Amino acid sequence: GNIWIGSYTGGVSVAILLKHPISILAHEKGNTHSLISNNVNDIEENPDGNQWFATDDGISIRNTLSGTWKHVLKEIVTISLCTSGNGNVWVGTYGDGVYLLDNNGRVLRHLTKQQGQLTTNYIFSVRQDMEGDLWIGGLDGCLIMFEKEKGSRRSFDVNWVQSIEPIDRNRVAVGTGKSF
């Protein structure tokens, strides 16, 4: 148990309980081996142990074994991260839809409103449920579910989605700007 604390302007703090003082990961101007931005919106750890940070200036990926950093989707406001069962990462953005990246940060897929796959490009939450279905929600658009088994897309009349959290095999909790 480490506790990872992302802040909007102060980078990322790491609390290693009862062992060490809090470590702070922060953007260092001109240093590519630091966060790309201190405006951190989400943090995700892959099965391989790499840490992904969604920021206002793209994604920073920290290799925990080597300590090296990689930056992808530069200059795109990234809001939400969700690691899929195979280690790929879904990324919700503010204005650019949803990306699927492989574990090295390469773009595998890009979903947008213009392509008809989403009802908004302003995505606040991307989550995968226990069945492997992908749930996507954001500003001024419907809640979308991509069914893994059927390969189909369903939309629900739930708008202004702020957060999505799988509860069990049959339920997903959705928090919106107006209700829960």
What residue ranges belong to the model's regions?
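Carboxylate-rich, polar loop motifs that coordinate divalent cations or form catalytic acidic clusters
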Residues: 1-180
